[in-house]
Amino acid sequence: MNKYDKNSLKAEEFINDGEILDSLKFADENKNNLELVDKIIEKARLKKGINHREASVLLACEDKERIKEIYNLARQIKKDFYGDRIVMFAPLYFSNYCVNGCVYCPYHAKNKHICRKKLTQDEVRKEVIALQDMGHKRLAIEAGEDPVNNPIEYILDCIKTIYSVNHRNGAIRRVNVNIAATTVENYKKLKEAGIGTYILFQETYNKKSYEQLHPTGPKHNYNYHTEAMDRAMQGGIDDVGIGVLFGLELYRYELAGLLMHAEHLEAVHGVGPHTISVPRIKAADDINPDDFDNGIDDETFAKIVAIIRIAVPYTGMIISTRESESVRKKVLELGISQISGGSRTSVGGYDEPESEEENSAQFDVSDNRSLDEVVRWLMNLGYIPSFCTACYREGRTGDRFMSLCKSGQIQNCCHPNALMTLEEYLVDYASDDTRNVGQKLIEQELEKIPNEKVRSIAKEHIFDIRNNNKRDFRF
């Protein structure tokens, strides 16, 4: 019998089934213990986070006044750590060849309906030009697991190609990587290639369910997959991103496992997850979400986002175009700090949108708006769309980023950097309507920069971006 130990490097000890079940039992027994709930909320107000057991109690609590408090606290913590900034990114799919048998993913090896594709380096270049012409500066690259079609050398070549493209004023300044669990040696290669965050979704933390959902292929190995972030950090990658696919297993189990993973990374490596993603299972070729019994409604989803935000206040939280405009609006205020815009989930979908017959997408997109529309929508809601990648390029990663974030000092860099990168977007890519909204917003936000010297420099840089065609300023 494995014992719970967040300092262990063994998956079944730092994500311990017995500890999760005990935590859920404790939460059930105490969900109406309002004195305890209030103590947990008060602890969360310190903005140092709460543990998986405490978060489980809040998730189980159904008292309307307490839930309202949780939401208000999540809003405040989001504001304190991330201000009104929302980081923009887009996914880029290289290949949907895959040897795994994941039953919830249309890339699974037995799916004969889907059109298999793999981009050449010339096609990668065309995709990047299309993404740069939209205005994107940050990508999350994706590929199925296939050692023949998608070896690490192919991924590295694609990353090199992405960074080499500078079309007009365009540049991809940060490439985050979402590929299958791999070796320390391969993580070292990714680090040397200059990646930003290494992202790997756990899918589910329940080992029994995990093995049933991944019946064949290398991904079947629960321990190897779950221990991937430790290998990534051993390989020198500073920033890692975790997440589960909500709907595969009971959401209360998943939240506890997710937070235990964050606690483990913090305990062992001194740095918790740079990002946490919260995807929900969605329709796709050969995949019907109704086949899975653990789907969650929008209100439960919002509560999960709020609790993750107060449990792990420093982490970036990501939501994709899997979610509708209305859902994205609701969870933005509760904790989300990064969203995608103008996304294509097919292989090669940016340069030439594919026909229905080609059908290479990983999931159906719920928010089909263009990046320009999403940017304008965010600004009209009072947010600052940010295309900033300065921390990564200034070496503010890993524990250096976390210390700045936890102290609140990151705002002194991020606010002006967000405004400068937004100005770049407005000048180079935005529609007239979006540009008008954005430049008014920038003028208002510049006056909110508390440091007079920083404010003055930011104004000078924005003038140069707007009038002198200068780019890539950063604090």
Task: Please report, for each region that a protein language model flagged, where it lies by residue.
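An N-cap/entry alpha-helix motif that binds or orients negatively charged groups
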Residues: 38, 42, 46-86
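Conserved C-terminal portion of the radical SAM core fold
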Residues: 143, 197, 223-287, 297-326, ...
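Generic structural signal for well-ordered alpha-helices
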Residues: 90, 128, 156-163, 187, ...
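Short glycine-enriched, charge-decorated loop/helix-capping segments at active-site entrances
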Residues: 213-219, 290-294, 360
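Core AdoMet radical
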Residues: 109-126, 130-233, 239-248, 270-277, ...
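Canonical Radical SAM [4Fe-4S] cluster-binding loop centered on the CxxxCxxC motif
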Residues: 82-123
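Radical SAM enzyme core and accessory elements
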Residues: 1-39, 43, 329-334, 343-475
